[in-house]
Amino acid sequence: LNRFIDQVYFNMVKIPAGKVELRDDRIKKEWQVQIKPFLLAKYVLTVELFYSITNRALNGNENSNKPVVNISWNDAIMFCNLLSKKAGLKEYYSVSNSGQIVSCNLDLNGYRLPSEAEWQYACKAGTPGYTYGELQKIAWYNENSNGQIRDVGKKEPNA
């Protein structure tokens, strides 16, 4: 287990403070968000890491370097809390007994999901506009993956 906790810690990337332009095309609105520095995992969550922390196999597989897919937002925040607990950090999310009410403990140091603004800012990696690089080089999608989920870390970073 410690190997996985260390793997998470050492694969975090420090994202510097800055500003990001967000937009909602449905309501034709744009706005700017100030971003504080934060840490973001270098890779998306893998099936192997998810299993090592939760002891829950996805699709009968526990040793895969493929990304976790088809889990709920609640599953994701429960993973963050469990990872925090196992790493000796304070849980970022508080969840009611019913699971219906979630609050964020902004002053705590636990693992969490990035906000929409943080995610956009990190994806842009200092580039202007809404394109992040040559798609073929930085992402798997239907045309270049043969419709298969691929291992993480096999494409160029977007920065």
Task: Mark where each language-model region is.
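N-terminal intrinsically disordered, low-complexity tails enriched in polar/charged
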Residues: 1-4, 58, 93, 153
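A short, compositionally biased domain-edge/stem linker segment
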Residues: 1-8, 99-102
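A short glycine-rich, aromatic-capped structural motif
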Residues: 4-59, 67-84, 122
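Functional-site microenvironments in short loops/helix caps that host divalent-cation chemistry
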Residues: 62, 73-159
